């Protein structure tokens, strides 16, 4: 009887071993997410027929370029080019940013944060002196135009870039250029961003 019990126990051991729950297989590792691919920058626009010198604006957010329209706004373009060549805009900050509308710069007060309450009120001290409103150069997306406080002839050093077409401004402000490269940069500008350098493209 004892022998029979021992034999039965010995025979049951292999069955007990194989009856154990198999160890869980390791789960396959989840695939690593792919790094996001940056969208390519928009291709530069072709210069407009009759366009003049191109002005490069290097900012803390990147660089954009705009063509000028000396045929339609000769006095304005001459005035802006003179300011650019004497480095008037270097170190100035963008003092006005309205998303989907405009970005604006050109006030020397913006070099000084203690004068922030005066940002947008100053210029070079020498206005253009002539209103050169044009029916040809309109406020399309990327237009560059002169800011003023009521009289286009008194526009001085402040200019703005339209972030979308703004036809309601046509005939009220002198459009003297258009962004042809780096339009995506203009949409990233915020109040306080600095113009590191502004120069005429060789």
Describe each region flagged by the PLM.
Residues 1-7:
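Bacterial N-terminal signal peptides that target proteins for export
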Residues 10-11:
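Hydrophobic alpha-helical transmembrane segments of integral membrane proteins
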